[in-house]
Amino acid sequence: MTHIVLPQDILIRHIGERNITPYETLQQAADPSHCIHIAYIAEGYTEAEMPTFIKDCRIAMEALFAHEPFKSLRSRFNIVAVKAPSVDSGTSEPSKGIWKNTALHSHFDTFYSDRYLTTLHLKDLHDWLAGTPYEHIIVLVNTEKYGGGGILNSYNLSMAHHPQFKPVVVHEFGHSFAGLGDEYAYAKEEINMYPKDVEPWEPNLTTLVDFHNKWEGMIDKKTPLPTPEPTDLDKPNARRDKWKVGAYEPAGYAQHGVYRAYPDCRMRTNAHPEFCPACTQAITQLIKFYTEE
């Protein structure tokens, strides 16, 4: 799909290159004409804290490229760090009555969920990024509190100073970049997000209604569907080399009727070190879509 932009369009305001937010290039793609542009942007970092922001960006970047297929296709990414300064350090926590004056006005408690960290100020976000090379956005928030959020083709937002920063920022990028769904469910609360008679659009979830275009081709013919979880799942000494691609419950916030491809995945837990085969396949296809003619 192609969207044509005509620079001479009368509805396009020409502002030149003034007032561009300072940024640093963290990685240059091998071929700038066929690459994916990622911009990290600071949220809740004061001017004095920008060195910390750049350090956090490098940590997040290396965490992403520790995962396949990003690791093998790293040269196809161009990455910048955009230094958007905030008046206050940190982010807002409405449930505690804490409101901060920050570049993107981010806050926890989105939809009244304690750990759902987002911003609704998309115009501000893109104003800060104007004039910088970007397609996909990763917002790093200067907070120690656990939380984040990822919205497909919009942005990924993650806390930067919690011990689980690295797996969370990669997990959220799975949402915002590749449209991956969450592969977990809550034991005490089932969210009926996916009708059981409709195939989810997310490439790593299925209701088995229209499974043919997902990861069906990866499954051994002897593997039963649905597939029982291995008995060593979530145990320290799990024999992951014995795990198989299948259709496992729970997934997609539902205990039953929605399936994931593999026992564990970056889209299921923070403990698992990699994306599952279905997610890896989907991410690979998308990277090639962006970077190959």
Question: Model-predicted segments: where are they?
Answer:
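Propeptide-to-catalytic entry region of secreted or membrane-anchored zinc metalloproteases
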Residues: T2, P7-H126
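Solvent-exposed loop/turn segments at secondary-structure junctions
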Residues: G44-A48, P85-S89, T143-G148, P163-F165, ...
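Active-site recognition of the HExxH zinc-binding catalytic motif
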Residues: M61, K166-E183
